């Protein structure tokens, strides 16, 4: 399941300073691909891990290019891709509509990753907001996220400077940043996604690499192993605060973060729906909820 990892190799692609709060003892590298349904399925776990233990780690998303190795998938029929997505949705609880491969297939596997790197040029948080919007457009709305107009729409929804984003999309900087991610992926010998690699402050210690999707408690145990003690989890914020921050979430995400069943999460969300705090958004597999922001003009 997990394996010891010798450590980060010397590379200009690694940040010269730890990301975010330099007092945090752990650094986590999450290897993903924006087209990967299993990476999308890990979102509830990452949200919960960040809320409960984020004070102990910085998290860096690395685009692995795994799905972008398109030549290996050219022989895969759209029907098989669609079936794989449906299977992933049923297994993870995060909806993804496989019929996109039959109706509106992604025309280029590299464009979404380059777009994410272009968005990151407006800041790490901007990049993460853009990644989320891109995933929503792909997995829920069945949009071809290699299309420039779709990517521009994602940029608008993520609150980016769209003109700057479109310029950066075709800049050497975005391409170089993506190449850095591919180099890190190769150096850390990542050949499956999602993969999480954990390092602590002691550069002589081995890291831990875990590939695939696992129950939440497994990731907590890995953090405890790297810290050398079992930390107390932080409590999640009030539900309305959580929704106000993330804006658009799945019932599955609410259930995981608050340790509720899907039915319990649905019940709590319906209470907020009656108060006109959220809007229910049915999707192919389950339900999403959009926060209604009364503070907007």
UniProtKB/Swiss-Prot annotation:
One GO cellular component, as annotated: cytoplasm
What top-level branch of life does the organism fall under?
A: Bacteria
Keywords of the record = Cytoplasm
Q: SUPFAM superfamilies, per this entry?
A: Thioredoxin-like
Give the main location.
cytoplasm
| Location(s) in or outside the cell | Cytoplasm
Q: Which InterPro entries match?
A: Adapter_SpxH, Thioredoxin-like_sf
Q: Which one Pfam family would you cite for this protein? A: Thioredoxin_5
Q: What does this protein do?
A: Adapter protein required for efficient degradation of Spx by ClpXP under non-stress conditions. Interaction with Spx stabilizes Spx and exposes the C-terminus of Spx for recognition and proteolysis by ClpXP.
How does the annotation summarize its subunit structure? Monomer. Interacts with Spx.
What family does this belong to? Belongs to the SpxH family.
- What does the record's free text say on domains? Contains a DsbA-like thioredoxin domain connected via a linker to a C-terminal domain reminiscent of the winged helix-turn-helix fold.
Name it: ClpXP adapter protein SpxH
What is the organism of origin for this protein? Answer: Geobacillus kaustophilus (strain HTA426)
């Amino acid at each position: 399941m997990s394996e010891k990892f010798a450590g980060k190799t010397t590379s200009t692609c690694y940040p010269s300073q730890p990301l975010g709060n330099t007092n945090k003892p752990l650094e986590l590298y999450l290897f993903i691909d924006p087209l990967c349904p299993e990476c999308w399925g890990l979102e509830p776990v990452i949200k919960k891990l960040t809320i409960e233990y984020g004070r102990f780690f910085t998290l860096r998303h690395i685009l692995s290019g795994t799905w972008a190795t398109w030549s290996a998938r050219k022989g895969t029929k759209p029907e098989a891709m669609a079936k794989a997505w449906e299977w992933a949705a049923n297994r993870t609880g995060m909806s993804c509509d496989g019929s996109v491969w039959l109706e509106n297939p992604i025309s280029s596997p590299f464009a979404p990753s380059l777009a994410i790197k272009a968005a990151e040029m407006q800041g790490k948080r901007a990049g993460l907001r853009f990644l989320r919007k891109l995933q929503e457009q792909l997995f829920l709305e069945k949009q071809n996220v290699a299309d420039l107009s779709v990517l521009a729409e994602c940029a608008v929804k993520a609150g980016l400077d769209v003109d700057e984003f479109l310029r950066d999309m075709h800049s050497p900087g975005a391409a170089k940043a993506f190449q850095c991610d591919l180099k890190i992926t190769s150096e850390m010998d990542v050949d499956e996604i999602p993969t999480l690699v954990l390092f602590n402050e002691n550069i002589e210690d081995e890291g831990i690499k875990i590939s695939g999707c696992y129950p939440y408690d497994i990731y907590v145990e890995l953090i405890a192993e790297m810290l050398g003690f079992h930390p107390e989890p932080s409590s999640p914020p009030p539900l309305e605060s959580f929704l106000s921050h993330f804006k658009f979430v799945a019932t599955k995400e609410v259930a995981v973060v608050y340790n509720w069943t899907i039915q319990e999460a649905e019940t709590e969300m319906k209470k907020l729906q009656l108060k006109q705090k959220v809007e229910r958004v049915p999707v192919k597999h389950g339900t999403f909820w959009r926060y209604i922001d009364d503070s907007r003009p």
